[in-house]
């Protein structure tokens, strides 16, 4: 997954079309999340998907549709070339073994339950305040569009 993440990051910067660049960025976020998940950081992998893929990429596509950028192709890499470059690298990525130190560490707690316990006990007032702010902002956005 690290190899695919590196290639996806290069493609996100190097592709000419903004839409293709966003798709490469989404691929990068998903592969990093899978890498975090398989390394034992389950919560961080899930949060990576929720925050980056769910919010930032969709927001960027929404902004691109509002700006109405005209795309004039000036050459570049054909998608078939990209696929032909990536296919031979897949066996290298599958054969990659995670670091033994990460596998030897065993956790006796569930990090999701710890975060949930902290949110709903110690940080409960802040959670309520954030909920009220979100509701007021949604109502304000609806009121502004009328």
Swiss-Prot record:
Top-rank taxon: Eukaryota
Class in the EC hierarchy, top level: translocase
Example GO biological process: mitochondrial electron transport, NADH to ubiquinone
TM segment ranges: 10-30, 43-63, 81-101, 124-144
Cellular localization per UniProt: Mitochondrion membrane
Topology term for the membrane: Multi-pass membrane protein
InterPro entries, per database record: NADH_UbQ/plastoQ_OxRdtase_su6, Nuo/plastoQ_OxRdtase_6_NuoJ
The EC number(s) this enzyme carries: 7.1.1.2
Pfam families linked: Oxidored_q3 (PF00499)
Gene3D superfamilies, per the entry: NADH-ubiquinone/plastoquinone oxidoreductase chain 6, subunit NuoJ (1.20.120.1200)
Gene Ontology molecular function: any one: NADH dehydrogenase (ubiquinone) activity
GO annotation, cellular component aspect: mitochondrial membrane; respiratory chain complex I
Keywords: Electron transport, Membrane, Mitochondrion, NAD, Respiratory chain, Translocase, Transmembrane, Transmembrane helix, Transport, Ubiquinone
Record's catalysed reaction(s): a ubiquinone + NADH + 5 H(+)(in) = a ubiquinol + NAD(+) + 4 H(+)(out)
Family: Belongs to the complex I subunit 6 family.
Function field: Core subunit of the mitochondrial membrane respiratory chain NADH dehydrogenase (Complex I) that is believed to belong to the minimal assembly required for catalysis. Complex I functions in the transfer of electrons from NADH to the respiratory chain. The immediate electron acceptor for the enzyme is believed to be ubiquinone.
Entry protein name: NADH-ubiquinone oxidoreductase chain 6
Organism of provenance: Candida albicans (strain SC5314 / ATCC MYA-2876)
Encoding gene (name): NAD6
């Amino acid at each position: 997954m690290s190899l695919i993440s590196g290639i996806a990051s290069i493609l996100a910067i190097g592709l000419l079309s903004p839409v293709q660049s966003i798709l490469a960025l989404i691929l990068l976020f998903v592969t990093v999340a899978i890498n975090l998940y398989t390394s034992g950081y389950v919560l961080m992998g899930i949060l990576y998907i929720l925050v980056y893929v769910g919010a930032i990429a969709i927001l960027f596509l929404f902004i691109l549709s509002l700006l109405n950028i005209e795309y004039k192709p000036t050459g570049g890499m054909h998608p078939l070339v990209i696929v032909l470059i990536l296919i031979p690298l897949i066996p290298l990525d599958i054969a990659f073994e995670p670091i033994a130190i990460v596998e030897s560490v065993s956790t006796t707690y569930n990090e999701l339950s710890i975060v949930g316990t902290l949110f709903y006990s110690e940080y409960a007032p802040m959670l309520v305040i954030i909920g009220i702010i979100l509701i007021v902002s949604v109502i304000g956005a609806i009121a502004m569009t009328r």
